[in-house]
Amino acid sequence: MNAASDNAPPIGPTGPTGPAGPDPSGLPGPLAFQLVLLRRMADHQPGLVEDALRTLGVSRADLRAANRRWQARMHAPRAPGGLQPYRALLGAPETVRARRLGDLTCEALTWPVPLWPDLRFEILTAARGVVWNAWLVRAPGAAAPVLRTTADLVPWSCTVDEVAAAFPPARPMEGSAPTRWALACTVPGPDPDSGGPHSLVTEFTWGLFQRLVD
């Protein structure tokens, strides 16, 4: 994911590493960020997004407004980038760990996501806080879904890494938007008598599975 930009002032007494600040709308920062995640997911799973909005106690107007402010924040000229837009809404990360990726070492930061208690929002950063990747991953200790057939690929049930591990060799494909990923993989059907495995494309938004494409 490309580096972000942010024109918001520092949040809290310790700046962007302090507690989460409110969105300009008055919504708590973590709630506003969940609406940002849901806005892109609404393109493929509008019904699930409507259910999520009811769970969060907000409206579609709130969702649109939160996303509009996020996009303005991300594309503001001459604004600081990297982690600051995320920290401004999410506050201090729950965990910060070094992670080795081949010959490179990056920093992995995670935050809880109340809408999905078994997931965490993870950001991988390079030197000087440049954001490499930002997506949803399974929380440590949370049970991952059992993925064996197409019937197990339920929207919002699994992450990119989980599908890639369940159906090797999955081939990464370019997503249709900056927050989307796709994997081409071969997946058995639910009925062994209905033929062999199917070659499919699994599509993800913010790292969470959304739909199958034949």
Question: Where do the language-model regions lie?
Answer:
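Short helix/turn-capping signatures at newly exposed starts of structured segments
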Residues: 2-182, 204-214
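C-terminal structured interaction module
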Residues: 186-214
